[in-house]
């Protein structure tokens, strides 16, 4: 970046990415460094040893050279992979370094062993300490580091003149809103890019866009990954941590990460290896102490906010992503935990990953940890470059803090157009005096709009063009490596059946508390007992008794039609956020999820009605014989599954609980009224509605089971062979589910 002021001494130090370019270039040139179709080097990660043995002394010396890292007067000995990477820079010309580069160079290995932080900064550093992460014998070349994931493809991300517009529909018209305007920049493996800006400036939008989560039709400009456009293949190489932690509240930390590992890691790993990876991530993130604690949510006490955020990050780093994007990973965390999180991102970057994070208001300690910075204001670019040079740049355009200020606070004030305690450039002052009064606030200071306009213009005229030119430089990867990012094929972690099994078990675990909810059991059993008492040993030898018992059968049909609809409508709207997140990451096929979600509730759906029917059947004196008992039970099951189908369909179509409950109550009421008990003479033009009612078919089947031996018609209902009713219920079971599935397919993945 060209600036009027010379860059600070720290800015002269090469960034980690610049140093690492050389390593990757050496690696790619190296015969050992060629990658296979999966972006995996042809050689297995070389054992650390032989000529490449990392000596503690050299490691210490190299850490001293690391820009942006204070070594604490040599007391903080960093023994992480980053040190190993840096050592390679020194040794790159030697054969030993080249052979080791094939496994450990930029982007080709993933091992962020611990979270280095100067001890003077954080006292309680135990969970993040890397002191024990790489034992002595690793340095001696005997053992691999604790966490050694398979190598990945490095991703060089460039974006040029990115724009994003949305159309906001109003009652009579629609308005176009520009959310991002002409944003350009780049981030390389080994770097952490921070996106900063006031609330609503477009950080999340830009992050989603860079993650490939916004449809290209509404965006302008170009975003390239290794100089190639986005492809579905990249989904499995990109980790995206959303601002809100979307996790299942009733799963423990270990269960959450183990299921993520089993679903997302490639088929080439065994189940045991995947479990081990989850345990490694737990250790890396310092989550051992809470690994068996439930995540928790609004109604369940669980892990702390910081731990939950780390689980969210773990969910993404478990796949060993080449590009990791995080939306406000530090919001809501105390400053120490926030710093730990950012240090962790550094370690991830140092393992050769490209890291982008939005950040709201970092402390000055955090601010200095970022390699690059993008400052946004009202969707426009106010600064892109090294974060260490940001203050120099703004002072070069006449904006400097007048009092001692956290640099992040200063930048955010500027981006907000708030120039209290900030020196105003004379150019801006002149403009205000010459310009109209609207550009000036009552205090005589330029308005926020005028400040914004000045900053955008200053960046455009002084920096933007040179930065854009830099984007034209080809990335230091050979064509073969670049081509890997353009492969169109998605990569599923596991086969369909395994996805189904994992999702089924996960569903059972997440809802286990519902299955054994005493409230629900009490609700069903007390209803059964009340029915049993009201219809106690009912006598059907009189017409009145028969009529009474028919009423009981109708109530059973209504009760088991009503109950499942209202439980099932919650299924998809409640899991919408999770479904969105997991489908955006291509974790599983929708069909596997759908089937697992709809079948994992079945055990409960059979236990409770069975208990209910046992109580009611014998208390009320229905036909005591195994055959009618089991047929009645089967009829109730058919009714439950059909009713559930309707609930699932309504939930999936509307995806909104309020709307879904309203529609469900109207539908259920209509079906109940058309069920054949309350009204017998229905006008012809509306009589067809009964055929849609599962209550009607269930009632007819229950009547048949009880009275087929001595009656042809009961209560105006003809008793026939019952095949039509069974067929109608079966059609409903599949039809409603198909409708629900198709609606989910149509659902847009919102990011
Ligand atoms: N689909 C959309 N429809 C309408 N407005 C949108 C849409 N997406 C984003 N916006 C608007 O774009 C602006 C930027 O939103 P974005 O969420 O990217 O901001 P942000 O910088 O991440 O804010 P915060 O820090 O508060 O999360 C906001 O004003 C938001 O309301």
From Swiss-Prot:
GO MF annotation list: ABC-type transporter activity; ATP binding; ATP hydrolysis activity
Region annotation (Disordered) ranges: 26-81
SMART domains registered for this protein in UniProt: AAA
Matches recorded under SUPFAM superfamilies: P-loop containing nucleoside triphosphate hydrolases
Any GO CC annotation of this UniProt entry: membrane
Stretches assigned to the ABC transmembrane type-2 domain: 498-707
Annotated ranges, domain ABC transporter: 157-403
InterPro entries per UniProt: AAA+_ATPase, ABC2_TM, ABC_transporter-like_ATP-bd, ABC_transporter-like_CS, ABCG_dom, ABCG_transporters, P-loop_NTPase
Residues that span the membrane, as ranges: 516-536, 552-572, 602-622, 634-654, 666-686, 722-742
Biological process terms in GO annotation: response to water deprivation; transpiration
Family to which the UniProt record says this protein belongs: Belongs to the ABC transporter superfamily. ABCG family. Eye pigment precursor importer (TC 3.A.1.204) subfamily.
Protein name: ABC transporter G family member 22
Naturally occurring in which organism (per UniProt): Arabidopsis thaliana
Species lineage: Eukaryota, Viridiplantae, Streptophyta, Embryophyta, Tracheophyta
Designated gene of the protein: ABCG22
């Amino acid at each position: 970046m060209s600036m009027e002021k010379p860059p600070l001494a720290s800015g002269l130090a090469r960034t980690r990415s610049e140093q690492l370019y050389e390593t990757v270039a050496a690696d790619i040139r190296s015969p050992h460094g060629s990658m296979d179709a999966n972006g995996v080097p042809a050689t297995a990660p070389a054992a650390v040893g032989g000529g490449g043995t990392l000596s503690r002394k050299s490691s210490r010396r190299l850490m001293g050279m690391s820009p942006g890292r204070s070594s604490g007067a040599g007391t903080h000995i960093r023994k992480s992979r980053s040190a190993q990477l840096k050592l390679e820079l020194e040794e790159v010309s030697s054969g030993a370094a080249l052979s080791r580069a094939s496994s450990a160079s930029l982007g080709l290995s993933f091992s962020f062993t611990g979270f280095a932080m100067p001890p003077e900064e954080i006292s309680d550093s135990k969970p993040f300490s890397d002191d024990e992460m790489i034992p002595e014998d690793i340095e001696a070349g005997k053992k691999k580091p604790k966490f050694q994931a398979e190598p990945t493809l490095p991703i060089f991300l460039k974006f040029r003149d990115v724009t994003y517009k949305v159309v906001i529909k109003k009652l009579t018209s629609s308005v176009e809103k520009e959310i991002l305007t002409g944003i350009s920049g780049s981030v390389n493996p080994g770097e952490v890019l921070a996106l900063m800006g006031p609330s609503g400036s477009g950080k999340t939008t830009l992050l989603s866009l860079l993650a490939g989560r916004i449809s290209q039709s509404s965006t302008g400009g170009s975003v390239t990954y290794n100089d190639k456009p986005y492809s579905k293949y990249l989904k499995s190489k990109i980790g995206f941590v959303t601002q809100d932690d979307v996790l299942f509240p009733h799963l423990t930390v270990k269960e959450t990460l183990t299921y993520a590992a089993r679903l997302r890691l490639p088929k080439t790993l065994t189940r045991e290896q995947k479990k081990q990876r989850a345990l490694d991530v737990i250790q890396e993130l310092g989550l051992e102490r809470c690994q068996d604690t439930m995540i928790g949510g609004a109604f369940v006490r669980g892990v702390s906010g910081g731990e939950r955020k780390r689980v969210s990050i773990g969910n993404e780093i478990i796949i060993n992503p080449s590009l990791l994007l995080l939306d406000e990973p530090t919001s809501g965390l105390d400053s120490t935990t926030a710093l730990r999180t950012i240090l962790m991102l550094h370690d991830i970057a140092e393992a050769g990953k490209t890291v982008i994070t939005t950040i709201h208001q970092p402390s000055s300690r955090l601010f200095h940890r970022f390699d690059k910075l993008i400052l946004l204001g009202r969707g426009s670019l106010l600064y892109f470059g090294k974060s260490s040079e940001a203050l120099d740049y703004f002072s070069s355009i006449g904006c400097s803090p007048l009092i001692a200020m956290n640099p992040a606070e200063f930048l955010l004030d500027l981006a907000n157009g708030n120039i209290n305690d900030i020196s105003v450039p004379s150019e801006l002052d002149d403009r205000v005096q010459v310009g109209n009064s609207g550009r000036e606030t009552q205090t005589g200071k330029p308005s926020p709009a005028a400040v914004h306009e000045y900053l955008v213009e200053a960046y455009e005229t002084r920096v933007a063009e040179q930065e854009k030119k830099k984007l034209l430089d080809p990335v230091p990867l050979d064509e073969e490596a670049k081509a890997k990012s353009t492969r169109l094929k998605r990569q599923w972690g596991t086969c369909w059946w395994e996805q189904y099994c994992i999702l089924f078990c996960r569903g059972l675990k997440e809802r286990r508390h519902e299955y054994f909810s005493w409230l629900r059991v009490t609700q069903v059993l007390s209803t059964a007992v009340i029915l049993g008492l009201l219809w106690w040993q009912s006598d059907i030898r009189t017409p009145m008794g028969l009529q009474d018992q028919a009423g009981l059968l109708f109530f059973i049909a209504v009760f088991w039609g009503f109950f499942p609809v209202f439980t099932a409508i919650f299924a998809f709207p409640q899991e919408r956020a999770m479904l969105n997140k997991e489908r955006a990451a291509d974790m599983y096929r929708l069909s596997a999820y759908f089937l697992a979600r709809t079948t994992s509730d079945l055990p409960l759906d059979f236990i409770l009605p069975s208990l209910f029917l046992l109580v009611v059947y014998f208390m009320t004196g229905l036909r005591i014989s195994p055959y009618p008992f089991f047929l009645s039970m089967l009829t109730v099951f058919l009714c439950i599954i059909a009713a559930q189908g309707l609930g699932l369909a309504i939930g999936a179509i509307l995806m909104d609980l309020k709307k879904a409950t309203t529609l469900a109550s109207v539908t259920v009421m209509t079906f109940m009224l058309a069920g054949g008990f309350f009204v017998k003479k229905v006008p012809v033009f509306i009589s067809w509605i009964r055929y849609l009612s599962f209550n009607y078919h269930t009632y007819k089947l229950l009547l048949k089971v009880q009275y087929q031996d001595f009656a042809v018609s009961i209560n105006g209902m003809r008793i026939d062979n019952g095949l039509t009713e069974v067929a109608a219920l079966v059609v409903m079971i599949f039809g409603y589910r198909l409708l629900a599935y198709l609606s989910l397919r149509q659902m847009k993945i919102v990011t």
